Amino acid sequence: MMLASIIEFSLRQRVIVIVGAILILFFGTYSFIHTPVDAFPDISPTQVKIILKLPGSSPEEMENNIVRPLELELLGLKGQKSLRSISKYSISDITIDFDDSVDIYLARNIVNERLSSVMKDLPVGVEGGMAPIVTPLSDIFMFTIDGNITEIEKRQLLDFVIRPQLRMISGVADVNSIGGFSRAFVIVPDFNDMARLGVSISDLESAVRVNLRNSGAGRVDRDGETFLVKIQTASLSLEDIGKITVSTNLGHLHIKDFAKVISQSRTRLGFVTKDGVGETTEGLVLSLKDANTKEIITQVYQKLEELKPFLPSGVSINVFYDRSEFTQKAIATVSKTLIEAVVLIIITLFLFLGNLRASVAVGVILPLSLSVAFIFIKLSDLTLNLMSLGGLVIAIGMLIDSAVVVVENAFEKLSANTKTTKLHAIYRSCKEIAVSVVSGVVIIIVFFVPILTLQGLEGKMFRPLAQSIVYALLGTLVLSITIIPVVSSLVLKATPHSETFLTRFLNRIYAPLLEFFVRNPKKVILGAFVFLIASLSLFPFVGKNFMPALDEGDVVLSVETTPSISLDQSRDLMLNIESAIKKHVKEVKSIVARTGSDELGLDLGGLNQTDTFISFIPKKEWSVKTKDELLDKILDSLKDFKGINFSFTQPIEMRISEMLTGVRGDLAVKIFGDDISTLNELSFQIAQALKGIKGSSEVLTTLNEGVNYLYVTPNKEAMADVGISSDEFSKFLKSALEGLVVDVIPTGISRTPVMIRQESDFASSITKIKSLALTSKYGVLVPIASIAKIEEVDGPVSIVRENSMRMSVVRSNVVGRDLNSFVEEAKKVIAQNIKLPSSYYITYGGQFENQQRANKRLSTVIPLSILAIFFILFFTFKSIPLALLILLNIPFAVTGGLIALFAVGEYISVPASVGFIALFGIAVLNGVVMIGYFKELLLQGKSVEECVLLGAKRRLRPVLMTACIAGLGLLPLLFSHSVGSEVQKPLAIVVLGGLVTSSALTLLLLPPMFMLIAKKIKIN
């Protein structure tokens, strides 16, 4: 009664309904324009990073002195999921992941409280703290500074001109500086002169520190005015620093008496090279969590344009990575597909209905339903991305279905009875099928509930897709019984109408087939179930995967060399690699390689680890057909570089892999234990085992040994005899090698560290280090070798920990087979061939974890959804057998999807699972339409056989229209090769394949099966 009242109200108040529709279009358009746009939904976890630096410390010292104390404080935080860390030379990165229910600001407050309590107990000189509020996908914009200025000047320009301006943009978390040289004022002492004059490193450090600060002395009043008194003691230039006095036993000396003061660079932990030409400086814009990427990048371009007049002559800012380009391509793919689908659907409507007015009446629901979806997307704080817009592409056919049923029925009633008033005829026709339409849409919505329950990365990725579908369907639900009856009353005519050529042709084919199936019900039903069982037996032979790889366009070539490589050797190697690629691969537009660590410490790499960003010219200009061929061509150009590990990834893919497991790769095998040597040996064995498995690609384990360490162990008794303290010894050695930072002073717009450091060639020879001598308190030069033991040892590049345990990781990508079967085989091979020592254990991580979690969730929730739909069908038809008969569409729909996946070599993935869910809804909806009409005819007093034959023929058009519209809506996805189409293609394959078998069941098997049931039970 309520549905009939809504229809009646809409037809009586047509002006109000039309005004409401116009308002929906207006607010929908507004929401579409003002909703943020991004490539993907925000899939990042609630994550807090702590970056701490202690210059000159080895990985083991960083682990023992910083990471372990922090772990004791940070483990067991409320809502914490995991705590992992990596310690390298001079720096540690601690990452804490929280449950998604924990607010990021609350998480940071919790971490900050614990961090503050432990920081005071950490060694003197520890720098850093919590990283900015960024996510693993915050790298949205990268550029280099090129031109005829020095690398120090480039870095100064980036750090103190460009970076402050870009950080002012709303949504920018920070701008990371990579490469170049950071300027420092360096005091270069002559140790012989210092010994002769009786000056120690501590004396020099104290004198410099005192003289680098101005201070205030108070206020002075004169004639009613106040003057603030400032004592100008700070030395702010090289000349001023040279004039600083140092007190000694021989009197007061100037620094320039025993040292030079020069402008040099600080010790570097990394560098950036470009196109094989030389070094450059890179800027990396990081976005805040939940920020509008497109808007940020637009403002970044505007700000860079404003800065152009202030750049030195001949200097340019060159962008080599812009996330918005990928976003625009992905959105363009979905938009193009959406437009193509709408065009195909409108053509299909006209072919089936043969009436332009009826086609218009149906087509009205599309812009209105999409507008409703955009309004809810905006209200839900979602973004317009590949998944949310992709959901609308998937839903496009389903949005039309209910309108098709309403208009088609009204069209039939008006054509059959021209004597009844048009409004009354439309009211009766809409009332007749209102329950079926509403229950059909509700059924489809219920089928998408399982997607809304997904957890983890797969939930964040696919929930927006399901949400946009549900929003659009809710719009359709209301519009089908309000605006569609009104539009039908305005555009349809009460005139007789003959069938179109297409429907006559289809009826001629269908009628004899239907007769055969109805006359031989038992034989055809038996044959159908044999087909069903045979088709379902394909399931074990269809591979399983989490998600198809998405082509981002640009690639990242990861390069890993021997851990002991020096900075200069690493730089020369990368320049040679870039030159080789540029020489042999003409499709490469630019190469930017970054080696080592960045300024913020968000991307810790050793001097042996390089991420090489490679951009290509337009694909139409390539000499090869596919991207895989192009990547093979790049690897072929590098065949002369022996002993180096090369592997390919993509900018976003790389960060997602790191986010999931802390490393890159489809599969990550984590080995936990205490001894680094044992972990290294086990990693090597597992890597060899994985290489023997079919489908393994780019199997790598981190080269975690082979770094040369020079252990200097002071003899405290010997030092006491000559009057040298441990603190003085440490400061001396640090000043002789890396440099001892004393303070930071303002120099114009920049801030420059002042440090004590010996000539750089001291660090170039172990012999020279052994010959170093420091001044005792008696003014005597004491060789280091006489008071300390110096030995060369091998040590780790880094120490990785997870949940307070050391670990090593072996990673592998998978090509040519599905991920699920590869992981199962890998587990079996490792269990058979790798013997673990006591207290050592292995875990597996990577993309397959998401798939397993999704499968587990869906295997629980989908049966519950089917049960819910059974109850909806039962309350609709008041019959358990009829409800079960309609649900029989589901397994037959599955068979078509499985056959289609098997035929084209696609895997069962989360997108394919979404396709099956969409398919279930369409299949059940068709069953509802068919069985509902059979029941209606039966209640009119017709015989069972007459009901089946007449009803099936009359419902041929709506069933085929529904299937064709749903299929054609997805057809553009099947043939699209644009950015982002890889994710949607498995879904389209499943739906198109399943529509064939489910439509065949609806049209050919449901009639005889209904006939058998109706003859045995009474249908009310």
Report the location of each language-model feature.
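Signature of alpha-helical transmembrane segments and their immediate interfacial
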Residues: 2-37, 431-433, 499-548, 588, ...
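Extracytoplasmic/periplasmic membrane-proximal domains and adjacent transmembrane bundles
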Residues: 9, 40, 51-53, 119, ...
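Transmembrane helices with small-residue packing motifs
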Residues: 15, 22-61, 117-123, 451-461, ...
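Solvent-exposed, non-transmembrane alpha-helical starts
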Residues: 19, 58-65, 101-110, 139-142, ...
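Solvent-exposed, membrane-proximal periplasmic/extracellular interface segments of envelope transport
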Residues: 62-133, 192-213, 234, 568-663, ...
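Helix-loop junctions and hydrophobic alpha-helical segments within the transmembrane domains
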Residues: 320, 327, 331, 407, ...
